[in-house]
């Protein structure tokens, strides 16, 4: 039986596509049963709808506080039987309501070799610092920004001539292979327990 996962995303959805492609090819034994977004204009919403994935979009400012916002998300996740939450370009910190309900079952992908360049625009930060190596990190989510325990990392090289767009393409190529592989590894370990 496939593990039920929810993908949380705020942007274009390239990692969502990679996860869905891995599910469809059989590389990832999971069912993406829910897409959660906080951005009504996010490209990922259309991608999820085309693939007939149930989608909810909530604007956090529509709620009295973060707890109320996350309580609504938690209710949706529980309603769908979600076992894991996969952050894929979700631009909000996860708070105690979801962290407690999904302890060690929320993971994130970040476009740097953490702890270097946490937060927004990690690729831009790496290019500005003229580093020769950056990469991708998959980590468990805790209450900090990109501070949870690291699960996997993969490096890429940056040449002197690489612009931000070229580095982003290299990063995404790694993300789209690494994330489904790590998700499957975690699901397999969970099933073995």
PLM ranges: what are they?
Residues 1-43:
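N-terminal Rossmann-like dinucleotide-binding module
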Residues 16-19, 44, 48, 98, ...:
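Hydrophobic packing residues within well-ordered alpha-helices of enzyme cores
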Residues 17-21, 46, 71-78, 177-180, ...:
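Amphipathic, non-transmembrane alpha-helical secondary structure
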Residues 22, 91-190:
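Donor/substrate-binding cores of folate-linked one-carbon enzymes
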Residues 30-72:
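Short, surface-exposed acidic-centric catalytic microdomains
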Residues 52-53, 82, 131:
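Short glycine/serine/threonine/alanine-rich loop segments
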Residues 56, 64-109, 114:
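Helix-adjacent hinge/juxtasegments
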């Amino acid at each position: 039986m496939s593990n039920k996962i929810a993908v949380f995303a705020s942007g274009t959805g390239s990692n969502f596509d990679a996860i869905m492609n891995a599910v469809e090819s059989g590389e990832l034994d999971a069912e993406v049963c829910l897409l959660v977004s906080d951005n009504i204009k996010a490209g990922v919403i259309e991608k999820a709808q085309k693939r007939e994935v149930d989608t909810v979009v909530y604007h956090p400012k529509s709620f009295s506080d973060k707890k109320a916002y996350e309580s609504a998300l938690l209710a949706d996740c529980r309603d769908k039987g979600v076992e894991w939450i996969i952050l894929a370009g979700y631009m909000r910190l996860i708070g105690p309501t979801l962290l407690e309900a999904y302890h060690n079952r929320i993971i994130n992908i970040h476009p740097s070799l953490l702890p270097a360049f946490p937060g927004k625009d990690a690729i831009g930060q790496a290019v500005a610092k003229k580093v020769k190596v950056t990469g991708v990190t998959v980590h468990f989510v805790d209450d900090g920004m990109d501070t949870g325990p690291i699960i996997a990392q993969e490096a890429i090289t940056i040449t002197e001539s690489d612009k931000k767009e070229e580095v982003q393409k290299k990063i995404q190529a790694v993300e789209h292979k690494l994330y489904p592989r790590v998700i499957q590894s975690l699901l397999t370990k969970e099933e073995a327990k």
